[in-house]
Amino acid sequence: MTVPQPAQPPQSARPAGRKTGALPPEDRERSPYTGWTRAHWEATADGLLQAVVPYASPRNGLINLPGARPSWAGPRSDGLEGYARTFLAAAFRVAGSGGRDPHGYLARYGEGLAAGTEHPVTEPGLDGKDPDAWPVIPDTRQAIVESASVALGLRLTRPWLWDTLDDKVRTRAVDWLLPALDPPPIDNNWWLFGLTVGGFLLDAGVETERAQASVDRALERIDGWYRGEGWYSDGDNQAFDHYNGWALHFYPVLHAHLSGDRALLDTYGERLRAHLDGYRRMFDANGAPMPFGRSLTYRFATLAAPWLGALTGHTPLSPGATRRLASGTLRHFVDHGAVTDEGLLPLGWYGPYAPMLQGYSGPASPYWASKGLLGLLLPDGHPAWTEREEPLPAETEDAVTTLRAPGLLVQATASDGLVRLHNHGSSSVFGPADPNYARFAYSTRTGPSAAEEAVAIVDTAANPGSDTTPVATPDNHFALLVDGASTGRGPVEPLGSGPGWAASAHTPRRADGSELAGVRVRSATLAHGRAEVRVHLVTGAAPGTPVRQTGWAVPDDGPTAQLHAVHGFTQDGGQPRTVPTGSTPFGEHTRTACLDGTVPDAPEAALFVSIASLTAEADPAPARTLAEVRLSGSHAIHVTWKDGTTSTLTLTADTATAP
C-alpha cells in the first residue's frame, strides 16, 4: 500500500536534533504509516529520562535544566518542575512494564523525594541553600502544579516506590503535598492538581476525609465549565485549547480509572469520548498537532487524551487509529528537531522558539510533554500496540467539522493532509492581543506570527506622516486602522455555527487595549475543500476608516497561501499585496497577502468578503476559482463551491443564520 510520508517543515525551523538515542528497526507491517511500535516509545522515553541525569542536584531532589531564562517562579521551582515532570514519564515507563525498572528510575526519584522534602524552603533562588530542597507549596504557587505530577507518579508506582519508603520519608512527603488540597489561587484547571493529590492520598489511606473533599470540590468546579460535546472552558471564560486534553480530561478521567470508580468513569469518560470525536481531526497527516492556544511548548502532551481514551475504553478511535495518531505525532517531533543533540526538550515547537512562550515557561516546562507518554501504561499485548495502524481522518477525506461548543471549525484536505482551524469561539486568558488565540485561523503548518512583531503595529503606508518603521502585520486578521495602527480582536463572542460555517463578533481594540466605542465587527467563515470564504460586517465605524484583511503567514518554502477580494476591498483595484509577517514556529521570515479597503459613506453597516486558501498541493488553482460568491438583501452571502454544492449565510447585528 502507498503510505503518506511525514512532510518536512522549513529547514530554518528544523534544527539538527537526535532521535533520543538508538531506536529499534521500523515495523512497516504492523505500523505502515509510522513504522513505530511500543519499543520506539520505550526508547524515546528512556532517551529523555537519561538525558536529564547530568542536571540533577546532588541527591536528585531537583533537576536544573539549562536554559536562557528561568520562569517567573524562580530557579528552585524550575528545578522541582524538572524533577516532577520527568518523574511522571518514569512512572509511566515503569508502571506500564509491570514494575520492571532496569535503568533504576525509581531509585533515583525515590532518593529525590526524600531529599526534596527533608527541609523545604521558601526562597525562590538556589544560592546558599540546600541544593536539593523543594519549595514550600503555600509560598510557591507553581509547586501546586508540580505536586500533581509528584502525586500521580507516586500513585502509579506505589507498589514499587511508595510502599518501600521509610515512614519518615512518607510522612514528610505527605506534609509537603497536603497544602495542594486547598482551593487553588487560580480559578481554572488548577483545581485538578488538588484532585490528583487527593486521589493519591485516598489510595494511600492518608488524610482521606480532606483528600476526598478536595476531589469533590474540583469535580464540582469543572462541571460548571463543561460546555458540551466534550469541551470544557478553562475557567469562567471562553478559553478552549489543548488544556482540554492534557488537563481538564486527563486528571479526572485518569483518577476515575485508577480509583475503579465506574460511576465517575461513566460520566467523565463519556465526555472524553465526545471530545476525541472532534479532536482527532486536528492532526495533520504528517503528525503535527494544531499549534493553537497557550503552552504549546508541551508539544506531544497533545497525545494525552487519545491515549487516555485507549486506556479506559472511552474513545471513538480504534486501537490502530490511536497508535497511528500518537506515533505519528511523537515521531513528527522527534524527527523535526524537538530533541536537542543532548537529548533535551528545549522551549519551543520544533527547535527553540521564544515568541511561543509564556511567563510561567521555564527550562523544564516542556516536560509536561511526559503526559503524552501515557500510552506506555498499556502493556505489550494491548490492541493499541498490536493492531495494524489505520489512517487519520485527514488522510481519508476532505472534511469540514463544526465543533459547536467551542465555536471552532476544523477543515482538512486529504490531498495534502493539511488541517486548518477557524476560531469563532475561543479567547485568551491573557487578553485579546494574544496571537495564540486572537487570529481567525490556524493550521498545522503555519503561524501564528510572533506577538511582539505583529500586534497593533504602526503602518506607514496608511499613516505617511509617521516616522515609525513598520515591522510585521498580523496574519489571518481583520483590522480597522486607527491612526495608522491595526486594531486587535477583542474577546470572541460566538454568534452561531452549523455545517461548514461558524461566526462570531468582537469589539476592536487599540494597541493600549481600549475599545473602539460603538464599533462592532461580526465575522464568519464558510469552508469547503481548501476554500475559505471570510466575511466581516462592520458597524459603528466612521466613513473612510481603513480596513485590512490578511491571509496565511508562510515562509518561502512553506505551503501556498492565496487571498482574493470579493467585496469591499477596493484599494489597489482589489489586488492583494504581499507584506511581512515576521517569525513563526515554521520559519524566521514569513509573508502574507493583504487586502485593503475603507468603510463606505452610505451604509450603516459595511460588508467585506474575501476567499482564502492554504494548500500544500503543487501548482494549485487560484483562489478565485474555488467559489462563486453572490451577495443579496441584508448581508446574505450565497456561495457556490467549485464542485457545485452551495452554502448560504446571513449576518445581522446580533446573529448569523443559515437555511
For each predicted feature, which ranges?
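Short, solvent-exposed secondary-structure capping/transition elements
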Residues: A95-G99, W162-D163, G381-H382, G544-V547
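Beta-strand-rich N-terminal accessory domains
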Residues: R388-E452, S634-I637, D643-T657
